[in-house]
Swiss-Prot record:
Keyword terms of this UniProt record: Glycolysis, Isomerase
Primary gene name: gpmB
Family according to the record: Belongs to the phosphoglycerate mutase family. GpmB subfamily.
This protein's record includes keyword Isomerase: yes
Taxonomic lineage: Bacteria, Pseudomonadati, Pseudomonadota, Gammaproteobacteria, Enterobacterales
Keyword Isomerase found: yes
Record InterPro entries: His_Pase_superF_clade-1, His_PPase_superfam, PG/BPGM_mutase_AS, PGM_Phosphatase, Phosphoglycerate_mutase_GpmB
GO terms for cellular component: cytoplasm
Active-site residue list: H9, E82
Record EC number: 5.4.2.-
Database matches in CDD domains: HP_PGM_like (cd07067)
PANTHER family: BROAD-SPECIFICITY PHOSPHATASE YOR283W-RELATED (PTHR48100), HISTIDINE PHOSPHATASE FAMILY PROTEIN-RELATED (PTHR48100:SF1)
Name this polypeptide is given: Probable phosphoglycerate mutase GpmB
Length: 215
């Protein structure tokens, strides 16, 4: 059985500003750096052997901090990037026009052909993150990889493993530096292949998540 751990990047400046990131970027906040350190401590205890990260700055920095703690090399994979949010990237959510908010809500509410102008569809996102995950099956026997990616990307990955369509309503919360685990296995009681063991674990973090503070 192959265990793969999934980590969302640490809190960023644009997360705090409620700004749409997509494939644009902003640095980790001091809290985000601390979150990544706490993931690193957990990763060391889990016996992580490989770190594979999105090549965007916020995930690279998160991966670097984790790697320092567990002594792993990092491989960067652009297929783990966040959903391309097109013309809405860098915008604060509260500044969107009614039409622009409609584009964004299509992705949240589950619209099969939803796509922000200039961006990509959820199916395109799903195809590339699943391809990145499949590459883990080529790692040496006994490997225990950790993937560092993004909220929408990882939510789509976990949801589709559970059998939902890529464009399904977004109902899985993966907070900054949450840890999820998926396994590749043959089982008499579960469908063979990828299964979800845990999703969105934040028990290793010692401070409230940003979305809890913004309620």
């Amino acid at each position: 059985m192959l265990q793969v751990y999934l980590v969302r990047h640490g809190e960023t400046q644009w997360n705090a500003e409620r700004r749409i990131q997509g494939q644009s970027d902003s640095p980790l906040t001091a809290k985000g750096e601390q979150q990544a350190m706490q993931v690193g401590e957990r990763a060391r205890s889990l016996g992580i052997t490989h770190i594979i990260s999105s090549d965007l700055g916020r995930t690279k920095r998160t991966a670097e901090i984790i790697a320092q703690a567990c002594g792993c090399d990092i491989t960067f994979d652009s297929r783990l990037r966040e959903l391309d949010m097109g013309v809405l990237e860098k915008r604060q959510i509260d500044s969107l026009t009614e039409e622009e908010e409609g584009w964004r809500r299509q992705l949240v509410n589950g619209t099969q052909d939803g796509r922000i102008p200039g961006g990509e569809s959820m199916q395109e996102l799903s195809d590339r993150v699943h391809a990145a995950l499949a590459s883990c099956l080529e790692l040496p026997q006994g490997s225990r990889p950790l993937l560092v990616s993004h909220g929408i990307a990882l939510g789509c990955l976990v949801s589709t493993i559970l059998g939902l369509p890529a464009w399904a309503e977004r109902r899985l919360r993966l907070r900054n530096c949450s840890i999820s685990r998926i396994d590749y296995q043959e089982s008499q009681w579960l469908a063979s292949g990828w299964v979800v063991e845990t999703a969105g674990d934040v028990s290793h973090l010692d401070a409230p998540a940003l979305d809890e503070l913004q309620r």
